[in-house]
Amino acid sequence: KKQLELIKPDIFWEVNTIIPVKLKGDYRIMITIHDMFPIEYVEYFGRVYNIYFKHNLKKTLKNTDMILYNSEQTKRTTEKFFPEAKDIDNVNAYIISNPVRKNWISTDENYFLYIGNMEKRKGVDLLINGYLKYKELGGKKKLIIGGKMQEDDINTLVHDAMEKDKDITYLDYVAHNKKLELYAGMSAFVFPSKAEGFGMPIIEVMRFNKPIIASNLPIFDEITDGNINTFDLYCSADEQIKNLAQIMLNYNTNVDESAYEAVVNRYLPERLGKIVYDFVNGYRNNN
């Protein structure tokens, strides 16, 4: 609050969804809405945070002039739970940082790769169990997993699986350049997320023209135009495991490089940055 009083901006952009305190000043407020997961997936966030999120976002929207969404899906779900958001000026533009600047030589080192947060919401439990089933069915590729460990039970599951199958490797947090090196050498990227607001890793992987295997969440269809391998997530846990194992055995290794390029170009930081710039500048000039 003190900094805002000193700076006196035309627009205050909050990069998170909720502003827990009421701000006072002669400036407009823009918030960023990434997802409605605390409402949609209470099992991952808990009942207390669900109540906190609903209560405080409703308060935040009363004082919000502009909304930046990361996807059309997020916009739809926000307006479903908070119809008042329909009356607030908004734009859909997800700015991706750390773009790929080096030209990597792609190879196939015979491994599946997952890089992301190590939690159930990202489908890591499904990935481990699906991979073990894939090996039971005769699959030969290795599995490399990277990402910050978030949950104790996932940590136990991963290390137990590594004891059972020496073809599973867990790398913990993966630095940016190492991640790109792994992308370049993988056979396919596996992203079995159970709840996703956008799915930035999929866009990153498309730069390498590698096959992608993902759950059939609607957001993945939105951002990829349907140009990836997907498996059915809307079934029992056992069926999910079987579905993932089967597609790991039989995924389409061919990639439509022109379709990938079109998706990558749509999410270039320069393009999305201009959308945000025009939105903010246009609002400031008209209000």
In which residue ranges do the predicted regions lie?
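Carbohydrate transferase catalytic cores enriched for Leloir-type hexosyltransferases
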Residues: 1-287
